[in-house]
Amino acid sequence: MAATEDVGYIDHPLLTEAFIERRLYQLQLADAAKQGHTLVCLPTGLGKTTVSLLVTAERLEAVGGTALLLAPTKPLVQQHAEFYREALQIPDDKIVVFTGEVRPEDRAELFESAKIVIATPQVIENDLVGNRISLADVTHLTFDECHRGTGDYAYVYIAERYHADAEEQLVTAMSASPGGTKEDIQTICDNLGLDGVEVMTEDDADVDEFTHDTDVEWKRTDLPQELLDIRDG
């Protein structure tokens, strides 16, 4: 995956020209994630989704198949879909969104023809249980907000099915805060079948230039009478 040094954008056959800014830390994380099932830890606002997109582009170009990106909420799914459609030279109708609003029979047909499926995990879990879809041809699976991958959350079942069914497997799991302890992180890795952990923080030199100090301004305001009554009651 080359970078165009003169304008600072990443050059790749599946990427929209002059769209993805070249950031060394994202390239490093993506290169690591291409080597195996990886947990990518990166602070909020620094482009975890871009890292996964770079891996997806490389997998689709080199291996083919379908990419599946899971996010826990409908707004996140829509946000990712908009970004992927802008950033990738793939027809919009080949980047499909699955939520509970899409009929199950329609999802089955769309899954077969899509290059990238972006979905809430509950929908994919239901379709797997109902044998409407197969993960056999999914060559890149991304778990966004992967710290949710515990207990009976749908991520855990989907990961189990993926590792059992997919022929060309690669998992990328993303989170700004995967857990407070090593044990928490290990649980996520075990549940999602991850082999490695890549961490970058705002203190890393390659990341620091893209972070900004936050200015906090405090303002006092008078509470309305009804809230005062509740407080003093």
Stretches with model-predicted labels:
Residues M1-G233:
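N-terminal helicase ATP-binding lobe
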